[in-house]
Amino acid sequence: RRVAHDDPFGAWEVDLHGHQVVYRVAGSGPPVVLIHGMVNSSRHWRPVALRLAERHTVIAPDLIGHGDSATPRGDYSLGAHATVIRDLLSALGIGSATVVGHSFGGGVAMVFFWQFPHRVERLGLVSSGGLGPEVSPLLRSIALPGASALVSLAGAERVTDGLERAGTALRRRGSGLGVQLQAIARALRPLGGPGAREAFVHTLRAVIDARGQRVGAADRLYLLEAVPTLIAWGERDRTIPIEHGRAAHAAVPHSRFVELEGAAHFPHLEAPEALAGALLDWIAATEPASLDDEAWRKLLRRRASARPRAA
Protein backbone atom coordinates (compact mmCIF):
# COMPACT_ATOMS: atom_id res chain seq x y z
CA ARG A 1 0.00 0.00 0.00
CA ARG A 2 1.32 3.41 -0.97
CA VAL A 3 1.58 6.01 1.81
CA ALA A 4 3.02 9.11 0.11
CA HIS A 5 1.56 10.17 -3.25
CA ASP A 6 3.17 12.35 -5.93
CA ASP A 7 6.61 11.91 -4.39
CA PRO A 8 9.50 10.65 -6.56
CA PHE A 9 10.83 8.89 -3.45
CA GLY A 10 7.42 7.83 -2.22
CA ALA A 11 6.67 5.70 0.82
CA TRP A 12 4.96 2.32 0.72
CA GLU A 13 4.08 -0.08 3.50
CA VAL A 14 3.76 -3.84 3.77
CA ASP A 15 2.92 -6.16 6.65
CA LEU A 16 5.63 -8.73 7.30
CA HIS A 17 5.10 -11.30 10.05
CA GLY A 18 2.44 -9.05 11.59
CA HIS A 19 4.60 -5.91 11.67
CA GLN A 20 4.37 -2.84 9.46
CA VAL A 21 7.47 -2.21 7.35
CA VAL A 22 7.68 1.11 5.52
CA TYR A 23 9.96 1.51 2.53
CA ARG A 24 10.60 4.10 -0.16
CA VAL A 25 11.01 3.49 -3.88
CA ALA A 26 12.35 5.63 -6.70
CA GLY A 27 13.38 5.19 -10.32
CA SER A 28 13.59 2.16 -12.55
CA GLY A 29 16.39 -0.16 -13.61
CA PRO A 30 18.67 -2.65 -11.83
CA PRO A 31 17.76 -2.62 -8.13
CA VAL A 32 19.79 -0.90 -5.41
CA VAL A 33 18.90 -1.33 -1.73
CA LEU A 34 19.88 1.47 0.68
CA ILE A 35 20.03 0.53 4.38
CA HIS A 36 20.14 3.37 6.91
CA GLY A 37 21.92 3.45 10.26
CA MET A 38 20.70 3.68 13.85
CA VAL A 39 18.09 6.39 14.57
CA ASN A 40 18.09 7.20 10.87
CA SER A 41 15.37 6.30 8.38
CA SER A 42 14.85 5.89 4.66
CA ARG A 43 14.15 9.63 4.44
CA HIS A 44 17.81 10.41 5.06
CA TRP A 45 18.75 8.70 1.80
CA ARG A 46 16.60 11.05 -0.34
CA PRO A 47 19.31 13.13 -2.07
CA VAL A 48 21.38 10.04 -2.86
CA ALA A 49 18.36 7.95 -3.84
CA LEU A 50 17.09 10.51 -6.35
CA ARG A 51 20.47 10.57 -8.10
CA LEU A 52 20.69 6.78 -8.20
CA ALA A 53 17.10 6.64 -9.46
CA GLU A 54 18.22 8.13 -12.76
CA ARG A 55 19.58 4.67 -13.63
CA HIS A 56 18.23 2.28 -10.99
CA THR A 57 15.25 1.16 -8.99
CA VAL A 58 16.08 2.30 -5.46
CA ILE A 59 14.49 0.57 -2.46
CA ALA A 60 15.15 2.10 0.97
CA PRO A 61 13.42 0.42 3.93
CA ASP A 62 12.83 1.79 7.39
CA LEU A 63 14.39 -0.90 9.56
CA ILE A 64 12.12 -2.34 12.24
CA GLY A 65 12.21 0.05 15.20
CA HIS A 66 13.16 3.00 12.97
CA GLY A 67 11.38 5.65 10.95
CA ASP A 68 7.73 4.76 10.34
CA SER A 69 8.14 0.99 10.64
CA ALA A 70 6.80 -0.89 13.65
CA THR A 71 8.64 -0.72 16.97
CA PRO A 72 7.82 -4.09 18.57
CA ARG A 73 9.43 -5.65 21.57
CA GLY A 74 11.60 -8.17 19.80
CA ASP A 75 14.86 -9.02 18.08
CA TYR A 76 16.95 -6.04 16.93
CA SER A 77 20.08 -7.96 16.01
CA LEU A 78 21.90 -7.55 12.70
CA GLY A 79 20.65 -10.94 11.56
CA ALA A 80 17.03 -10.11 12.36
CA HIS A 81 17.20 -6.91 10.32
CA ALA A 82 18.87 -8.77 7.44
CA THR A 83 16.07 -11.34 7.43
CA VAL A 84 13.39 -8.63 7.25
CA ILE A 85 15.17 -7.09 4.25
CA ARG A 86 15.28 -10.51 2.57
CA ASP A 87 11.55 -10.95 3.13
CA LEU A 88 10.80 -7.42 1.92
CA LEU A 89 12.71 -8.02 -1.32
CA SER A 90 10.95 -11.35 -1.77
CA ALA A 91 7.57 -9.67 -1.28
CA LEU A 92 8.54 -7.11 -3.93
CA GLY A 93 9.65 -9.80 -6.36
CA ILE A 94 13.33 -8.79 -6.26
CA GLY A 95 15.74 -11.70 -6.35
CA SER A 96 19.10 -9.93 -6.08
CA ALA A 97 20.36 -6.36 -5.83
CA THR A 98 23.26 -4.06 -5.14
CA VAL A 99 23.12 -3.57 -1.35
CA VAL A 100 24.47 -0.42 0.32
CA GLY A 101 24.50 0.21 4.07
CA HIS A 102 25.46 3.19 6.23
CA SER A 103 26.91 2.82 9.76
CA PHE A 104 24.79 0.16 11.53
CA GLY A 105 23.22 -0.45 8.13
CA GLY A 106 26.64 -1.42 6.83
CA GLY A 107 26.72 -4.18 9.42
CA VAL A 108 23.24 -5.26 8.33
CA ALA A 109 24.40 -5.26 4.70
CA MET A 110 27.39 -7.48 5.49
CA VAL A 111 25.27 -9.94 7.47
CA PHE A 112 22.73 -9.93 4.64
CA PHE A 113 25.55 -10.97 2.29
CA TRP A 114 26.81 -13.71 4.62
CA GLN A 115 23.30 -15.10 5.13
CA PHE A 116 22.04 -14.71 1.56
CA PRO A 117 25.10 -14.36 -0.72
CA HIS A 118 23.17 -15.30 -3.86
CA ARG A 119 21.02 -12.18 -3.40
CA VAL A 120 23.88 -9.65 -3.35
CA GLU A 121 25.24 -8.35 -6.66
CA ARG A 122 27.48 -5.70 -5.10
CA LEU A 123 28.13 -4.54 -1.54
CA GLY A 124 28.56 -0.89 -0.54
CA LEU A 125 29.71 0.11 2.95
CA VAL A 126 29.36 3.78 3.94
CA SER A 127 31.05 4.78 7.23
CA SER A 128 30.20 1.24 8.23
CA GLY A 129 30.00 -0.36 11.62
CA GLY A 130 31.47 -3.78 12.26
CA LEU A 131 34.96 -3.10 10.90
CA GLY A 132 36.76 -2.41 14.19
CA PRO A 133 36.09 -1.93 17.91
CA GLU A 134 36.49 1.85 18.14
CA VAL A 135 33.33 3.96 18.26
CA SER A 136 32.42 7.34 19.73
CA PRO A 137 32.31 7.67 23.55
CA LEU A 138 28.69 8.86 23.30
CA LEU A 139 27.53 5.59 21.75
CA ARG A 140 29.54 3.57 24.28
CA SER A 141 27.87 5.50 27.10
CA ILE A 142 24.40 4.64 25.79
CA ALA A 143 25.28 0.96 26.18
CA LEU A 144 25.61 1.48 29.95
CA PRO A 145 22.77 0.70 32.38
CA GLY A 146 20.53 3.68 33.04
CA ALA A 147 21.36 5.43 29.77
CA SER A 148 17.72 5.69 28.70
CA ALA A 149 17.51 9.13 30.31
CA LEU A 150 20.36 10.33 28.10
CA VAL A 151 18.54 9.00 25.02
CA SER A 152 15.35 10.80 26.06
CA LEU A 153 17.27 14.04 26.44
CA ALA A 154 18.98 13.62 23.06
CA GLY A 155 15.64 13.24 21.32
CA ALA A 156 13.95 16.15 23.10
CA GLU A 157 12.51 18.74 20.74
CA ARG A 158 14.42 21.57 22.37
CA VAL A 159 17.70 19.75 21.74
CA THR A 160 17.04 18.87 18.10
CA ASP A 161 15.59 22.31 17.35
CA GLY A 162 18.64 23.92 18.95
CA LEU A 163 20.99 21.82 16.83
CA GLU A 164 19.01 22.66 13.70
CA ARG A 165 19.14 26.41 14.43
CA ALA A 166 22.85 26.27 15.20
CA GLY A 167 23.46 24.34 12.00
CA THR A 168 21.52 26.87 9.94
CA ALA A 169 23.48 29.76 11.45
CA LEU A 170 26.82 28.06 10.79
CA ARG A 171 25.89 27.26 7.20
CA ARG A 172 25.06 30.92 6.59
CA ARG A 173 28.58 31.71 7.73
CA GLY A 174 29.99 29.16 5.32
CA SER A 175 30.99 26.62 7.96
CA GLY A 176 30.88 22.94 7.02
CA LEU A 177 30.07 22.15 10.66
CA GLY A 178 26.57 23.48 10.01
CA VAL A 179 25.70 20.59 7.71
CA GLN A 180 27.01 18.12 10.29
CA LEU A 181 24.90 19.64 13.09
CA GLN A 182 21.80 19.52 10.91
CA ALA A 183 22.54 15.88 10.07
CA ILE A 184 22.81 15.07 13.78
CA ALA A 185 19.52 16.88 14.45
CA ARG A 186 17.75 14.84 11.76
CA ALA A 187 19.18 11.64 13.18
CA LEU A 188 18.07 12.44 16.74
CA ARG A 189 14.50 13.58 15.98
CA PRO A 190 13.02 10.05 15.84
CA LEU A 191 14.08 9.52 19.47
CA GLY A 192 11.23 11.80 20.53
CA GLY A 193 8.90 8.79 20.63
CA PRO A 194 9.12 6.21 23.45
CA GLY A 195 8.86 3.20 21.11
CA ALA A 196 11.69 4.50 18.94
CA ARG A 197 13.86 5.22 22.01
CA GLU A 198 13.45 1.69 23.33
CA ALA A 199 14.15 0.21 19.88
CA PHE A 200 17.26 2.36 19.53
CA VAL A 201 18.67 1.21 22.88
CA HIS A 202 18.01 -2.45 22.03
CA THR A 203 19.58 -2.01 18.57
CA LEU A 204 22.67 -0.27 19.93
CA ARG A 205 23.24 -2.79 22.71
CA ALA A 206 23.11 -5.61 20.16
CA VAL A 207 26.37 -4.33 18.65
CA ILE A 208 28.04 -1.95 21.16
CA ASP A 209 29.03 -2.21 24.81
CA ALA A 210 31.05 -0.01 27.15
CA ARG A 211 34.31 -1.04 25.45
CA GLY A 212 33.16 -0.31 21.90
CA GLN A 213 31.80 -2.30 18.99
CA ARG A 214 31.44 -5.89 20.10
CA VAL A 215 30.30 -7.35 16.78
CA GLY A 216 33.00 -7.38 14.13
CA ALA A 217 33.50 -8.61 10.58
CA ALA A 218 37.29 -8.99 10.59
CA ASP A 219 37.19 -12.79 10.53
CA ARG A 220 34.89 -12.83 7.49
CA LEU A 221 36.17 -9.99 5.35
CA TYR A 222 37.89 -12.49 3.07
CA LEU A 223 34.42 -13.53 1.87
CA LEU A 224 33.88 -10.09 0.35
CA GLU A 225 36.42 -10.83 -2.39
CA ALA A 226 33.58 -12.70 -4.11
CA VAL A 227 31.45 -9.58 -4.56
CA PRO A 228 32.31 -6.10 -5.91
CA THR A 229 32.80 -4.01 -2.77
CA LEU A 230 32.85 -0.24 -2.31
CA ILE A 231 33.96 1.30 0.99
CA ALA A 232 33.16 5.02 1.32
CA TRP A 233 33.95 7.18 4.35
CA GLY A 234 33.64 10.78 5.46
CA GLU A 235 37.12 12.24 5.99
CA ARG A 236 35.95 13.95 9.22
CA ASP A 237 34.13 11.00 10.75
CA ARG A 238 34.54 11.06 14.54
CA THR A 239 31.84 8.46 15.23
CA ILE A 240 33.60 5.54 13.52
CA PRO A 241 37.20 6.26 12.50
CA ILE A 242 38.11 6.29 8.82
CA GLU A 243 41.00 3.94 9.63
CA HIS A 244 38.43 1.14 9.84
CA GLY A 245 37.54 1.73 6.21
CA ARG A 246 41.14 1.88 5.08
CA ALA A 247 41.96 -1.37 6.89
CA ALA A 248 38.93 -3.12 5.40
CA HIS A 249 39.91 -1.92 1.94
CA ALA A 250 43.38 -3.40 2.42
CA ALA A 251 41.85 -6.69 3.56
CA VAL A 252 39.34 -7.08 0.70
CA PRO A 253 40.96 -7.80 -2.67
CA HIS A 254 39.69 -5.69 -5.57
CA SER A 255 37.63 -3.43 -3.28
CA ARG A 256 37.31 0.28 -3.99
CA PHE A 257 37.86 2.95 -1.30
CA VAL A 258 36.48 6.48 -1.53
CA GLU A 259 37.26 9.23 0.97
CA LEU A 260 34.52 11.87 0.91
CA GLU A 261 35.90 15.35 1.38
CA GLY A 262 34.15 17.55 3.92
CA ALA A 263 31.88 14.77 5.19
CA ALA A 264 31.77 13.35 8.71
CA HIS A 265 29.61 10.37 9.74
CA PHE A 266 26.62 11.12 7.49
CA PRO A 267 28.02 11.36 3.95
CA HIS A 268 24.57 10.79 2.42
CA LEU A 269 23.50 14.07 4.04
CA GLU A 270 26.82 15.96 4.14
CA ALA A 271 28.16 15.07 0.68
CA PRO A 272 25.26 13.44 -1.20
CA GLU A 273 26.43 14.39 -4.69
CA ALA A 274 29.90 12.97 -4.09
CA LEU A 275 28.55 9.78 -2.54
CA ALA A 276 25.93 9.24 -5.25
CA GLY A 277 28.55 9.85 -7.94
CA ALA A 278 30.91 7.34 -6.34
CA LEU A 279 28.14 4.73 -6.15
CA LEU A 280 27.07 5.26 -9.77
CA ASP A 281 30.66 5.06 -11.05
CA TRP A 282 31.33 1.89 -9.05
CA ILE A 283 28.15 0.17 -10.21
CA ALA A 284 28.83 1.07 -13.84
CA ALA A 285 32.43 -0.19 -13.63
CA THR A 286 31.67 -3.60 -12.07
CA GLU A 287 29.84 -6.74 -13.10
CA PRO A 288 27.25 -8.05 -10.64
CA ALA A 289 28.25 -11.08 -8.60
CA SER A 290 26.28 -14.29 -9.02
CA LEU A 291 27.06 -16.72 -6.22
CA ASP A 292 25.43 -20.13 -6.04
CA ASP A 293 25.87 -22.71 -3.28
CA GLU A 294 28.82 -24.36 -5.01
CA ALA A 295 30.69 -21.06 -5.43
CA TRP A 296 30.04 -20.23 -1.77
CA ARG A 297 31.29 -23.66 -0.69
CA LYS A 298 34.52 -23.21 -2.64
CA LEU A 299 35.05 -19.78 -1.13
CA LEU A 300 34.61 -21.11 2.41
CA ARG A 301 36.88 -24.10 1.85
CA ARG A 302 39.81 -21.83 1.08
CA ARG A 303 39.94 -21.08 4.81
CA ALA A 304 38.05 -24.02 6.33
CA SER A 305 39.23 -27.61 6.48
CA ALA A 306 37.53 -30.53 8.19
CA ARG A 307 39.74 -32.88 10.21
CA PRO A 308 39.28 -35.55 12.88
CA ARG A 309 39.06 -34.12 16.36
CA ALA A 310 41.80 -35.24 18.72
CA ALA A 311 40.61 -37.49 21.52
Predicted region positions:
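Catalytic histidine-centered segment of alpha/beta-hydrolase-like enzymes
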Residues: 260-276
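Active-site loop/oxyanion-hole signature of alpha/beta-hydrolase fold enzymes
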Residues: 16, 24-26, 60-104, 277
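Conserved HGGG/HGGXW glycine-rich cap/lid loop of the alpha/beta-hydrolase fold
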Residues: 19-68
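Flexible "cap/lid" loop of the alpha/beta hydrolase fold
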Residues: 114, 122-155
